[in-house]
């Protein structure tokens, strides 16, 4: 009945031109960001002798606090001016590049400078993520209106694939 119809409508968004590209990009972005959370703890918590950083739970917690604070600053301060200057269409790939750069830099942190390096990398990752979410939602809204597609269906499809990416 209704659930089946809702699922079919959401699934149909995965084949709708510009909308599907953003939805798939969102899925890949969320998947990568979720994997970072899991693997980051393994890397930082691994003993120095095994190639990790030997961090404890409190040290990891501080790094994740930096990610959270940087995300708040990004969405509370940076997103407005950058959106007006660049627009969502340019910010989406820029946000992927920024976040991707941060993710690539994580394994290159060196134990003797780990805290400073990880704080900088965490800020880079958080800024990229903080720019991605609003940009992708804004673009989806614009494309849905332009193509005359129900906004609820489009946003529901985006949230569905985001949830699926977190499960993977």
Predicted regions and their residues:
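C-terminal ends and interior cores of transmembrane alpha-helices
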Residues: 97-112
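Juxtamembrane intracellular "pre-TM" segments in multi-pass secondary transporters
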Residues: 1-24, 46, 50
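A late C-terminal transmembrane helix in Major Facilitator Superfamily
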Residues: 147-168
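Short amphipathic helix-loop junctions that connect adjacent transmembrane helices
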Residues: 38-60
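Hydrophobic core of transmembrane alpha-helices in multi-pass small-molecule transporters
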Residues: 114-132
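Intracellular juxtamembrane helix-capping segments at the cytosolic ends
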Residues: 130-147
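Helix-to-loop junctions at the C-terminal end of transmembrane segments
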Residues: 73-88
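Pair of pore-lining "gating" transmembrane helices in MFS-fold secondary transporters
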Residues: 15-40, 123
